[in-house]
A protein has these predicted regions:
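Short, hydrophobic beta-strand segments
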Residues: 157-162, 218-228, 287-297, 333-343, ...
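Terminal amphipathic helices with adjacent charged low-complexity linkers/tails
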Residues: 65-68, 72-73, 146-151, 171-288, ...
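A glycine-rich phosphate-binding loop feature that marks nucleotide/adenosyl-phosphate handling sites
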Residues: 21-28, 111-116, 120, 186-203, ...
Length: 452
């Protein structure tokens, strides 16, 4: 993704979905997981920027898919073979199940990735096969080519770095901050901040997080971004928010300080620190390593603070260390609890915690997978989709009747004996690491602890 945006920059353009993994994320991977990230409340997901896809299906068909007007759709429906069938059956499914789809799909910016039934037709009523291909994780066909929409790079930008004396306060304040019309709001907890303070990256951002006499210790921050092509408009937005922050500073449930960064050069220093969060957590010492398995849950932003407090209680009850950061405006926080997967007793925590967190996300009308695809976690799909899950199985069967493409992920075709993968029945790195002698593991510690 970074290479694509570097090529677009001389033309004043960019590919919008902003990922913290942008220096290694591929466009194909973004399409197959329907990736999103910072600024998604304004810019949406990858699907929103895909104009057309060229796909190769198992019967050898090569097909260009894009938004279709009604007459175009009706013409395609008349075709024989897979393409005609898929367009006929998918449109019929959407028509017959629309009320169930509307009720089942939560009102989230992230949506239910992996056969996104809610967007088979767009706001204009156009049918678009890409709604199920984007986020399909390669389970329906092979994406060979994509035509992408690109946007103009905003001329002016500002980042307001707001400090709080508790992480809960930062989350509860984020919903109110959205009323001030920012481009995005990112949050970082004290665990990640303290790790950043011990890293070389802190030298580039230290001045934006000053330690003033009499101030409480920073336990959480919200990074509020504004962008605009009009400098006066941008400054007016910043001035309105900072005036509000001055008025409420120190009040219960509010922030106690802030700084303002102006211009892409300065702002990118702070985003660089935020993007380094996973690496900072991965550099922690000891046998317990941060493990991604409940790392991208999503709930409606108004439920986020209550949900996260219960989520943290689950992790605290297991005595686990963790840090949290993410897209608080979209209701998505990333967390990787530290677990020694070489220890069989700790390995079992993956199942126990995932079951608890899955139940929590349903309690708060959210998702277990809000950003990084379903993968092995697809075993929870039937519980989330309910009566719609058999419809996903039908879709899988149209494209992949013999379960050959990324089997066990998202949905299985309606075949006897074919099941989704289960999170505790797949081989883990910890199981492999147990085979390495202790002295060898100690001698090559840097390699063993590398998280990629």
């Amino acid at each position: 993704k970074d290479q694509l945006n570097a090529a677009l920059k001389p033309y004043g353009l960019f590919f919008a979905p902003e990922l913290s993994t942008s220096n290694r994320a591929t466009v194909g991977g973004m399409i197959n997981t329907d990736a999103s990230g910072q600024g998604s409340c304004m810019y949406g997901k990858t699907r929103d920027h895909v104009l057309s896809l060229t796909s190769v299906f198992l019967d050898g068909t090569v097909w260009d898919s894009f938004a279709l007007e009604e007459d175009e759709l009706e013409e395609i429906k008349q075709q024989a073979g897979l393409i005609g069938q898929v367009h006929r059956d998918l449109d019929q499914l959407y028509t017959e199940k629309k009320s169930v789809i509307d009720a089942k799909f939560p009102p989230l910016n992230r949506c239910l990735t992996g056969y996104d039934l809610a967007h088979i037709r767009d706001e204009s009523g156009r049918f678009n096969l890409n709604s199920i291909l984007c986020g399909g994780e390669g389970s329906l066909g092979f994406i060979a080519e994509a035509k992408l929409n690109v946007l103009t790079i905003p001329k002016y930008s500002a980042l307001i770095n707001i400090q709080y004396d508790s992480f809960e306060t930062s989350m509860r304040d984020a919903k109110a901050l959205m009323d001030w019309g920012p481009t995005s709001i990112e949050t970082v907890d004290s665990k990640v901040l303290n790790l950043a303070m011990g890293d070389i990256v802190w030298d580039t951002v230290r001045s934006y997080f000053p330690v003033n006499e009499g101030d409480p210790e920073i336990q959480g921050i919200n990074l509020v971004e504004y962008t605009s092509d009009d400098e006066e408009e941008l400054r007016a937005k910043v001035d309105r928010l900072t005036a509000h922050l001055d008025d409420v500073s120190g009040q219960p449930g509010k922030s106690f300080g802030y700084t303002v960064a102006l211009g892409a050069g300065e702002i990118n220093k702070i985003w660089g620190m935020r993007k380094k969060s996973v690496g900072l957590l991965g550099n922690a010492k000891g046998e317990r390593r941060p493990i991604p398995f409940v790392e991208d849950t999503a709930v409606p932003p108004e439920n986020l603070a209550d949900y996260i407090m219960e989520f943290r209680a689950v992790l605290d009850n297991h005595g686990l260390a963790y840090g949290m950061f993410g897209h608080v405006d979209a209701g998505v926080l990333h967390v990787r609890p530290a677990i020694d997967m070489k220890d069989e007793a700790q390995e079992h925590l993956i199942r126990e915690i995932t079951d608890q967190v899955a139940a929590l996300t349903q309690k708060y009308n959210g998702l277990l997978w809000g950003e990084h695809g379903k993968g092995v976690r697809s075993e929870y799909a039937p519980a989330f989709f309910g009566e719609l899950y058999p419809e996903l199985q039908r879709i899988k069967g149209w494209f992949d009747p013999n379960n050959q493409l990324n089997p066990g992920k998202i949905a299985t075709p309606l075949l006897a004996g074919v099941e989704l993968l289960k999170i505790d029945e797949v081989q883990t790195r910890g199981q492999l690491d147990r085979q390495i002698p202790d002295d060898t593991r100690a001698a090559y510690g840097s390699a063993v602890y590398c998280n990629g």
